[in-house]
Amino acid sequence: MASIHPPVCDFGWPAPDFNLVNVDGRSLSRDQLMGEKGLLVMFICNHCPYVKAILPRLVADCRELNSLGINSVAIMSNDPTVYPEDGFEHMQKIATELHFPFAYLVDPSQQVAKSYGAVCTPDFFGFNSQGQLQYRGRFDESRKETASHSSRDLFHAMRGIAETGVGPAEQIASIGCSMKWLED
């Protein structure tokens, strides 16, 4: 399982639209999910140890961000034939068990992941209320294990975006498992 780093933030880049199916069966779009102060788009999956290491804290931070006007959405774009744990029924199970405060969408064609330029799980895209990219960085210093101390990089960046509409100038790239792309 290779560790992948995404590129740095391209400030002002517009959030691509999408319309994907949530674990509850509803189709949801970017515009439906946009919060009053912004939107956090998170590419995650169920099998990746980098995601597993942060998931309970990510859920808690997304709850807190929601109270600040930042909505969150998780998108699973991996090919589930590579890792069956990433299949839709497992997505439903984990979303229920952890009481996700955000939609968990499936991207079976992987077109949304490609339009965002997602390269790993987790991969975070923080947009302000105008849909302009302001953060593309890490959750915190956790890797495959939970860090003993959390700097809460993602939370602090998104809180700043809620307050000012602008992300931090200094951002540390996320690290995670490579996307599991469909065979051509």
Q: What is each stretch, according to the model?
A:
Residues M1-Q171, S178-L182:
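Chalcogenol-based redox active-site neighborhoods
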